[in-house]
C-alpha cells in the first residue's frame, strides 16, 4: 500500500519523531509506514488522515494507484 505520509509530514514541518509523538507510536513505526514496510491498523490510518485533515483514501493508496 502506497501512502503520502512523508509528503504530508514534511509539508507540516514535522520530524518523524514529532509525528510519532502526536500519534502515540514509535518513530520506527512512522518510518516503516513512510517506506511502505508496514501497513497501519485502521485506527492508526484514520488518526493519520484526521491529523492531516484528509480522508484515508487521500493518504493511503492501493499499490496500483497514485
Labelled PLM ranges:
Residues 50, 58-66:
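Short, charged recognition helix plus adjacent turn
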Amino acid at each position: 500500500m502506497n501512502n503520502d505520509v512523508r509528503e504530508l509530514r514534511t509539508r507540516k514541518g514535522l520530524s518523524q519523531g514529532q509525528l510519532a509523538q502526536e500519534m502515540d507510536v514509535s518513530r520506527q513505526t512512522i518510518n516503516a509506514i513512510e517506506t511502505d514496510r508496514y501497513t497501519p491498523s485502521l485506527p492508526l490510518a484514520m488518526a493519520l488522515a484526521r491529523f492531516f485533515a484528509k480522508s484515508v483514501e487521500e493518504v493511503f493508496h492501493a499499490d496500483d494507484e497514485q
